[in-house]
């Protein structure tokens, strides 16, 4: 399906690009999340009229994300979990737990924005986690997992 992107989408393209994607990806993700529209002649003409407005909104989102990213980059947060004497956690610290921790600290972060390439944290100690505030703004945050011996 041919679509026109209404914002920058990772691994796909930038605002205004006309790309071909699988029908399911367009119908189930891009179009419902208002990231794209079908690339009909009418939609392309309407997009060209609204292009400046959409670019302004995208620039504002990027600037806001960069401002939050400057505050958040390099920050360290502590989370306490029950653990055994060998340093392994009972359970794990997931991206949802980290997003909740960041929300309590005053940052608007969804769990999908927290990237944990090595999977959930299962050991006590310091771990570096990435937070993707925008497709162009990715910051590193240190999570210090403290063991609460049961």
UniProtKB/Swiss-Prot annotation:
InterPro entries: Ribosomal_bL9, Ribosomal_bL9/RNase_H1_N, Ribosomal_bL9_bac/chp, Ribosomal_bL9_C, Ribosomal_bL9_C_sf, Ribosomal_bL9_N, Ribosomal_bL9_N_sf. One of its GO terms (biological process) is translation. Keywords: Ribonucleoprotein, Ribosomal protein, RNA-binding, rRNA-binding. It comes from the Bacteria. One of its GO terms (cellular component) is ribonucleoprotein complex. One of its GO terms (molecular function) is structural constituent of ribosome. SUPFAM superfamilies: L9 N-domain-like (SSF55658), Ribosomal protein L9 C-domain (SSF55653). Pfam families: Ribosomal_L9_C, Ribosomal_L9_N. PROSITE patterns: RIBOSOMAL_L9. Binds to the 23S rRNA. Belongs to the bacterial ribosomal protein bL9 family. HAMAP family: Ribosomal_bL9. NCBIfam families: L9. This is Large ribosomal subunit protein bL9. It comes from Burkholderia ambifaria (strain MC40-6). The gene is rplI.
């Amino acid at each position: 399906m041919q679509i026109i992107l209404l914002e920058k989408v990772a691994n796909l393209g930038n605002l205004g690009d006309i790309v071909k994607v699988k029908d399911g990806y367009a119908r189930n993700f891009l179009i419902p999340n208002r990231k794209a529209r079908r690339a009909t002649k009418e939609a392309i003409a309407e997009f060209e009229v609204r292009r400046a407005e959409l670019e302004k909104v995208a620039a504002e989102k990027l600037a806001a994300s960069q401002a939050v990213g400057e505050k958040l980059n390099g920050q360290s947060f502590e989370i306490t979990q029950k653990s055994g004497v060998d340093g392994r956690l009972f359970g794990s610290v997931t991206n949802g737990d980290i997003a909740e921790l960041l929300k309590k600290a005053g940052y608007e972060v969804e769990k999908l924005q927290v990237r944990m390439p090595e999977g959930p944290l299962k050991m006590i100690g310091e771990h570096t986690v990435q937070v993707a505030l925008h497709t162009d703004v990715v910051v590193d945050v240190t999570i210090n997992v403290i063991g609460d011996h049961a």
